[in-house]
Structure formats: C-alpha cells, structure tokens
Amino acid sequence: GTENKTKVEDIINLERYEYFDYDLYPDYQNSIGFSQRGCRLACKFCVVPKKEGKNKGNSAINGIWRGDPYPKNIVLLDNDFFGQPNWQEKAKEMIEGKFKINFSQGINIRLIDEESCEMLPQINYRCSKFKNKRIYTAWDNLGDEKIFMKGVERLTKYGVPTSHLMVYMLVGFKKAETMEDILYRFNKLKDLKCLPYPMVYDRNNKELKKFARWVIQRHYKFIEWEDFSQENRNKFYRDQKGSEDQMDLFHNNCVVSALSETGDT
C-alpha cells in the first residue's frame, strides 16, 4: 500500500542487489530473498508494479538459502511467484531440496492455473514461524468473488485444504464499501473454513480497526460482530453477568485460542 517507489538499487546505484544484512539480527536463522520481482496485476492500492515492473525471475532458491548450518527455511518476498517465466524450475528446487517455504507476500489466487495448483501441494509451504501449513492469498474486492472462488476450488481439487488458506481482506479502500459488503466477504471466508485477515486501508477508521481486531483475535468465534461493536460491547458483558476479571479472562481465552490455532503469530 505504500507510495514509496524507491528501491535499494536506486540508492546505491546498482542494477541489482540481493544481499541481506543478517548481522543486524544474529539470532535469526531463516533465509530471506526474492525468487522473482514484479507482478502481473496492477491493483490501484499497490505500488509493486510501479516499483518493480513486470514479472521477472530473480534468485534461485539455493541462492537464497544461507547454507549449512542454517535450516532450510526460506522466507520468500515474492509478490507473484507463479507469474515468473521459470517458476517450475524453482518449485522443483524447493521440492528436491526439501525446503520449507513461507510465501510471505502470498500467491495470486485469481491467476492460479491448473499446473500451479498441481505443483503447490508438493511444496512444503509454511506459516511465518514455519510451524503450520499455510498459504497466504487475498480477496480484496467483492467484485472478484467468482474468480476468487474458482481459485479456491482449483486449490482444493489438487489437495490444498481451505483450512490452510489465510485470506487477506482489504477493507476501507473503496469509499462506497459498506459494512454489509465487508461482512459478506468475511462470512463467505468463514464458511469456507479459511482464516480471514482484514487489512485496514484507512487507519483513521475506528470501526474498521475494531473489525480487524474482532477477526484477527478470533473474537468472532465467541461474539457476534453486533455485540462486539463499541456501542453494544459493554451491554453484552453485562448481559453475560461477567465481572471485570471474567471479561479479562474471556478476552485472554480468545487471543490464546487464536494464536494456538493459527501458529502464524
């Protein structure tokens, strides 16, 4: 979402720079890098196409790995892995090299095809902590419902369960978007058994920030949105006849449940 189009290469006046200063984080064990740059899409809220251009290949997977004694955990910064010309070779590297891959920037589910879906379950894809199986993707626009659902259908056809999908939901970008529109997307994702994750575009919108909190901390498993909203929240707890301590315990249980379930935070 940032409007900053400056690249490291622009600052140091090099055509390409792919080195990461791990010395800043001496205890960090994973390997970080790009196997590709750019994106096939041109979303209005995203700077990637302007900053990185069209999709092109970058480093090999073995080139990203820091080597022994570091674990074969790769944090990919790719914005469109399956859009690069030689993604099959890099997927083969992942599989044959027995790497764990965190697709940290997600995959483009709207553009995913049969070949990509067939290959993906063979890759050991993981969450950011490399504990749970996780694929990150997005459903940012209500109008993309059909193509999003088609992508989900393709993934499940080839063995990626919906419970492995964390789906980012951009909220607050479209001025005409209503809370009903947002809840429609959320409920669809919940019914699919995906993990919804709202991304609030307008950080000044308190209601949307509250909605994000309700979803991300998995309060929705215990409280309806109407009850969680600020004007009704206190009334809800009073109706439950809960003391202040019980309210705190209830909140903590929600958070613990969310964290233990996802393994992503």
Where are these regions (language model features)?
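Short catalytic/ligand-binding loop motif for oxyanion handling, primarily in non-cytosolic enzymes
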Residues: 5-9, 41-45, 52-55, 83-85, ...
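Auxiliary Fe-S-binding modules of radical SAM enzymes
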Residues: 159-160, 170-265
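Glycine-rich beta-alpha loop elements in corrinoid/cobalamin-binding modules
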Residues: 1-32
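Alpha-helix termination/capping residues and helix-transition junctions
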Residues: 40, 68, 129, 157-159, ...
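Canonical Radical SAM [4Fe-4S] cluster-binding loop centered on the CxxxCxxC motif
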Residues: 27-65
